[in-house]
């Protein structure tokens, strides 16, 4: 360390000790490219990467794949806030399907829209519903107003339907 140090010759012992301690950092292999990539960042650093990408909602209980998807979509959401695409990117990483119906597609007042959110087998909690409303309000266009938020669930199974048509005349035959 004495040959390669960048400190001046009159440095204090504290400065020399600090330089030696900081020199150990150079031996740590850290690829900045991997740290700033949501797909390759170590799982224990994902909360800090989410903070750096300004993720609007974060939950430690999410599976790792959901956390990575939310971080990956954060840039798109911030670039496209105020669009239907941003609303989709906010809701879909949480595992819900979304269908948007805008005012010109039906007879609703101008400047309004409705959302149909399809939940999976897990359902939806009251806290998640409130959080979803907050996220949608943050991502929706400022000139649009949400007038309907429907939560739906598809139930797979078989449905048998049948029909019968009966047509005929009543004929009465009298003797004679």
UniProtKB/Swiss-Prot annotation:
It comes from Escherichia phage P2. Its main location: virion. Keywords: Late protein, Viral baseplate protein, Viral release from host cell, Viral tail assembly, Viral tail protein, Virion. It is found in: Virion. Induction: Expressed in the late phase of the viral replicative cycle. Coiled coil: none annotated. GO terms for cellular component: virus tail, baseplate. One of its GO terms (biological process) is viral tail assembly. It comes from the Viruses. Belongs to the P2likevirus gpI protein family. InterPro entries: Tail_protein_I. The keyword Cytoplasm does not apply. Baseplate protein that may be part of the wedges of the baseplate. Plays a role in tail assembly. This is Baseplate protein I.
């Amino acid at each position: 360390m004495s040959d390669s140090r960048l400190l001046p010759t009159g440095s204090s012992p504290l400065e020399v000790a600090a330089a030696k301690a900081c020199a150990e950092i150079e031996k740590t292999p850290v690829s900045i490219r991997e740290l700033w990539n949501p797909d390759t960042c170590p799982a224990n650093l994902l909360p800090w990467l989410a903070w750096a990408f300004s993720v609007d909602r974060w939950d430690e209980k999410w599976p790792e794949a959901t956390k990575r998807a939310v971080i990956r979509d954060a840039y798109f959401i911030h670039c496209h806030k105020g669009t239907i695409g941003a609303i989709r990117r906010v809701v879909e990483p949480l595992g819900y399907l979304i269908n948007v119906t805008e005012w010109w597609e039906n007879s609703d007042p101008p400047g309004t829209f409705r959302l149909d959110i399809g939940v999976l087998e897990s359902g939806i909690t009251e806290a998640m519903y409130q959080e979803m409303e907050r996220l949608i309000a943050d991502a929706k266009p400022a000139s649009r107003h949400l007038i309907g938020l429907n939560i739906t669930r598809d139930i797979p199974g078989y449905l048998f339907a049948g029909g019968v048509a009966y047509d005929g005349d009543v004929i009465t035959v009298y003797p004679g």
